[in-house]
Amino acid sequence: MAETKLLDGRLIVTTGDITKMKTEAIVNAANTSLMGGGGVDGAIHRGGGPAILEECKQIRKGRYPDGLPTGDAVVTTAGSLSAAHVIHTVGPVWHGGGSGEADKLTSCYRRSLEEAANLRLKDVAFPAISTGIYGYPKEKAAEVAFAAVREYLASSKLPETVYFVFYSPADARLFLDTVNG
């Protein structure tokens, strides 16, 4: 699938392996432990090597001894990945939609973008947060993700470009179909 540009070219939807993105930062759909896991989280930890885990351990010892709260974000090195930074955020587990999941997912995107802007990063790449093992319905997650990024970019110059990186063309198409009505 070719890249699709939205929001005056500031949002780019593409497919591929997020660990191979050459953006200044990639976002990790982490768990609260920050110790790596399955899916994107495991792939990022494996691809970046031990430097990511070591920095996550230091974060756990310091700021977040009980784990990173859902909806928050922290930045680490990207180790041996192409990106310079990994922004770890913890998405909500889907419980039917009545447990504040949309607000928590919005916070994941907003906090990740704030962290990128604080570092003066020009671009950042997101996976589809919470749509894997956490069970967030992909259409609903697409609506939340798009709205959160659109709102953030409307009032912030940085990051200049946001990528949504989908592993499969089908998921990218579903996202585009959802946000284009």
Question: What do the PLM-derived regions correspond to, one by one?
Answer:
Residues 1-181:
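Macrodomain-like recognition of ADP-ribose-binding/processing modules
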